[in-house]
A protein has these predicted regions:
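Divalent metal-coordination and catalytic microenvironments
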Residues: 7, 20, 25, 47, ...
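Short, surface-exposed connector motifs at secondary-structure boundaries
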Residues: 86-90, 116-121, 145-147, 225-234, ...
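Metal-associated gating/positioning segment near the N- to mid-region
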Residues: 45-115, 132
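Alpha-helix-loop-beta-strand connector modules within alpha/beta enzyme cores
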Residues: 102-118, 166-180
Length: 455
């Protein structure tokens, strides 16, 4: 057995001084004191918080986005995730138009199986709605996929409102949840054209062409459609605006149920002034080209306040990494050609812990980045809590560690980090995935114990 001793276990009820024993891939005992037997391994967690492994419910690894392949494979991405304390990702498999969901799922398994340090589950994104996809929803549930995604943006992915309504109705019937990218795509297309024709070609044009109204309108539309479908469960992903937040508040005030809200560190910590960053070649602002874009400082403040108040359920990353040099720089003369996305899977826990120091305690960090993702996506209580019989995914966290985030020392396979120079408070001292030590002091051990997580 592996026994974690002298730590403070993070539970919904608060910190609990106790020891924890893992045998194989399960937590087998939690007690005030567990004495090791001959052959047991002891992990001293004195001065540390012991979390259930963090869960990132929104990643895009080894993925073609319509412009390019993301920089991180499942191998590099899950290794980076584990180095930060994340023991499970939920990645977006995508059934492009003309591709069936079973074929898409098989392809994502081919990319991920046997290569992962952290565990992985899959959402299934639908780029079209037809009778074959309707019939295959149940097959996806049987294959362990209980969450799906549709888009209101991107011409090659977007469903119309009637199709979205039908997806919501079907998922409510089979017990699934729909995650939705909420931007008004036709409006974005028009505004991109207008901004470019005004002579704005640099990264700042990205944010100008995707204003807060594009998100808020789509959030409101989604919630009305979900209500029409009998309050079908929906997850509003990567919420970035105050207006979008107000649309969610309005729906909840009407009494609508089954609304879940996700945001990301970038929308809680950065703002749209980043697009003016020049760097050595005058193009550093492209690092922050992601969709939705970084917003005004007022949006950031509103989301931070809502997070602390408990109005946001989960913090994910939307990790979708592209190199600045060789990928993003192909849009040097046209912001519309910059691949959308950025890295974040490695630094999410420490970024949130540090940025909200004094506002969010360890119980809150656990709720937002472990327990709630497990609940929303059908993994709780197997994951998302420290309990006898739960999976042995555990992060021993040293809150006293101090270090600086640098692209040169990160494990994400990308040539920059949006958090360059960030003074981080805390670090994953030891990370166990399925009972195997995967990370020691923020560095990988080389083990690849990650498994597929059917839900």
């Amino acid at each position: 057995m592996i026994i974690i001793k002298n730590g403070a276990l993070v539970t919904p009820q608060g910190l609990r001084r106790a020891d924890l024993a893992m045998d194989g891939d399960k937590i087998v005992r939690i007690a005030a004191a567990i004495e090791p037997a001959e052959g047991d391994t002891v992990e001293d967690a004195a001065g540390c918080w012991v979390f259930p492994g963090f869960i990132d419910g929104h990643t895009h690894m080894q993925c073609w986005t319509g412009m390019d392949w993301t920089a991180d494979s499942f191998e590099t991405g899950t290794r980076a995730a584990a180095c930060g304390g994340t023991t499970t990702i939920v990645d977006y498999a995508t059934a492009d138009r003309g591709v069936t969901m079973p074929d898409a799922l098989a392809e994502w398994h081919r990319r991920a199986d046997g290569t992962c340090t952290a565990n992985y589950a899959f959402h299934m994104a639908l780029a079209e709605w037809n009778e074959r996809n309707r019939a295959d929803l149940s097959a996806m549930r049987e294959a362990g996929v209980s969450s799906f995604k549709t888009y209101f943006a991107y011409d090659h992915l977007r469903l119309d409102d009637a199709e979205t309504l039908e997806v919501l109705e079907e998922l409510k019937y089979i017990g699934g949840i729909l995650c939705v990218h909420c931007e008004n795509g036709t409006l974005v297309n028009e505004l991109q054209k207008r901004v470019f024709e005004q002579g704005i070609h640099g990264p700042e044009g990205h944010a100008l062409s995707r204003p807060d109204v594009c998100e808020a309108e789509a959030v409101s539309r989604l919630l009305y459609l979900a209500h029409l479908a009998g309050d079908a469960p929906v997850n509003v992903v990567h919420l970035s605006t105050k207006l979008g937040l107000e649309a969610i508040r309005a729906a909840k005030a009407r009494g609508q149920k089954n609304i879940y809200v996700e945001t990301c560190p970038q929308y809680l910590m950065l703002d749209d002034t980043c697009y003016l960053e020049q760097g050595e070649d005058g193009f550093a602002g492209a690092k922050y080209v992601m969709s939705p874009p970084l917003r005004h400082a007022g949006d950031r403040a509103a989301l931070r306040e809502a997070l602390v108040a408990g109005e946001i359920d989960t913090i994910a990353t939307d990790h979708c990494s592209f190199n600045l040099h060789g990928q993003k720089d192909r849009g040097r003369d046209d912001f519309r050609a910059i691949p959308n996305g950025g890295p974040g899977v490695e630094h999410r826990p420490v970024a949130i812990a540090t940025s909200f120091e004094g506002q969010l305690g360890p119980e809150d960090l656990c709720r937002l980045m472990s327990e709630n993702p497990a609940r929303v996506f059908g993994m709780y209580p197997r994951k998302g809590c420290l309990a006898e019989g739960a999976d042995a995914d555990v992060c021993v966290w040293d809150p006293k560690a101090r270090w600086t985030i640098r692209a040169t020392t990160q494990h994400q396979a990308v040539d920059y980090t949006p958090l360059e120079g960030f003074e981080a408070h805390g670090r994953a001292k030891a990370v166990f995935v399925n009972g195997v030590l995967a990370v020691r002091d923020g560095e990988p051990t080389g083990a690849q114990p990650g498994r597929y997580v059917p839900r």
